[in-house]
Regions:
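Nucleotide-activated chemistry modules centered on ATP-dependent adenylation/adenylyltransferase
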Residues: 1-21, 48, 52, 57-117, ...
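Glycine-centered tight beta-turn/hairpin loop motif at sheet-sheet or coil-to-beta transitions
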Residues: 23-27
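N-terminal cap/recognition module
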Residues: 28-57
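Boundary detector for helix-to-coil junctions that initiate low-complexity/charged tails
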Residues: 377-415
Length: 415
């Protein structure tokens, strides 16, 4: 069972949208906190809260009662969204039936105004620049508002939310993010949730889309276009499913009240850097770094995200002084083996870019090809070993007569 009610509270200059969830065995409350100045823009529909909790609902299954008004077109699309995730994660995603107190089916002529999630990283920086400069083609929109959302379940937000010693450093990161947006004349609205306080069976990489889209949906009555910067290139060597933001299930996170634009999914990281190559301030200040505890205003230069960005700069032959950007400005291609497990997709993007443009330095192409070949060999060996091991365990378990004990035996060795 799942039942959702929402109440509103105002306190200390903020407005809280508090979701009360009856989960059957227990009850939870999760809030979204916004500056009180945003109140006039927020919808009274329950659409955002349904999307916010869609993964929670799938984890429980069954009838899900929504004690408010929901767009019929959204519910129609969410049915297909759920079907996607049931196929991708059958052990976690159950069938659900969303039952709203009232379904609204009012066609709306969508305006050209947009709201966007902004993090200060390469994806969102490139997307903001593309739309601001009119470079996004027929999907170019008039961005009116940027949202910075914190309090999620990713590692950086979790530390920023709970660790008092980290909060000051995190504030510096937010200031840096604001400096990038303000360089183009945009302000950032800071939104906080306490989602990190709640439990989930999903990986953050699977469920993050629900948080970011739902918070933007709070503004759906005024800004009919929600812009999400894609973190995944759609090339066949790069695209990963399941993944929170993807070109399949993202299509079902829409209604007749808004259009979701997943911007930049047809671009590699190198293409995105090329897009902002004339925006020097962003090149030197964007937050492409996973290390959040650095005391300086520079990026660490050691994490995999920093290493990938350095690699991209070098692949594009950019004349950038790494001393201005990184605590560790060194660049050595021999270091790139250890992050291949996390960065192999980005290595493939570099090679793809070179096939199209033929401009990446030869030593980079040769080194990345060597690393990827080695990585592929290791993966194939591990897969073969695991397959033979599984066959061996299944063969032994055949002699266990009781099915329940047999399955328990097999699962024990799979752990």
């Amino acid at each position: 069972m799942f039942e959702l009610k929402v109440r509103e509270e105002e306190k200390d200059g903020f407005i809280y949208k508090i979701m009360q969830m009856d989960l059957g065995a227990k009850k939870e409350e999760v809030y979204i906190r916004l500056p009180i100045s945003e109140k006039e823009y927020l919808t009274n529909m329950y659409d955002p809260y349904v999307v916010f909790n869609i993964f929670k609902m799938m984890s429980i299954g069954g009838d899900c009662y929504i004690r408010g008004k929901v767009s019929k077109s959204l519910l129609d699309n969410l049915e297909m969204f759920v079907n996607c995730w049931k196929i991708w994660l059958p052990d976690k995603c159950k069938d659900i039936k969303i039952i709203a107190d009232e379904e609204i089916d009012e066609p709306v002529k969508l305006n050209n105004d947009a709201i966007m999630c902004f993090s200060g990283g390469l994806d969102s920086v490139a997307t903001l620049y593309r739309h601001h400069k009119g470079l996004a083609g027929r999907n170019n929109r008039n961005i009116k508002k940027l949202l910075a959302i914190t309090g999620s379940r990713n590692i950086s937000d979790a530390r920023g939310y709970n660790d008092e010693t980290y909060k000051e450093i995190y504030k510096k990161r937010l200031i840096r993010m604001e400096s990038i947006s303000s360089d183009l004349g945009f302000n950032v609205v800071h939104v906080l949730t306490n989602l990190t306080d709640t439990d989930t069976i999903f990986e953050w990489g699977d469920e993050f889309i629900a948080l970011y889209i739902s918070v933007m949906m709070l503004y759906q009555d005024n800004y009919n276009n929600l812009i999400m910067a894609s973190d995944e290139f759609v090339g066949q060597d790069s695209i990963v499913v399941p993944h929170g933001s993807n070109p399949i299930s993202n299509n079902f996170l829409q209604s007749n009240k808004f259009k979701l634009i997943t911007d930049g999914q047809f671009m590699t990281r190198l293409d995105k850097l090329e897009t902002i190559k004339d925006w020097d301030f962003a090149l030197k200040n964007m937050l492409a770094c996973d290390e959040c505890y650095t005391e300086t205003n520079k990026l660490c230069g050691k994490c995999y995200k920093c290493l990938v960005t350095k690699l991209n700069y070098k692949a594009l032959n950019y004349n950038i002084d790494f001393n201005e950007i990184y605590d560790d400005p060194s660049f050595n291609l021999e270091e790139y083996d250890w992050i291949c497990e996390y960065a192999n997709i980005f290595y493939k993007e570099v090679l793809y870019y070179d096939k199209i443009h033929h401009t990446v330095p030869k030593e980079i192409v040769v080194r990345l090809t060597e690393i990827l070949n080695k990585y592929t060999t290791i993966i194939n060996i591990n897969n073969n070993v695991n397959k033979k091991y599984e066959e061996f365990i299944n063969k032994i378990s055949w002699w266990i007569p009781v099915k329940k004990l047999r399955e328990k035996f097999i699962n024990k060795f799979k752990e």
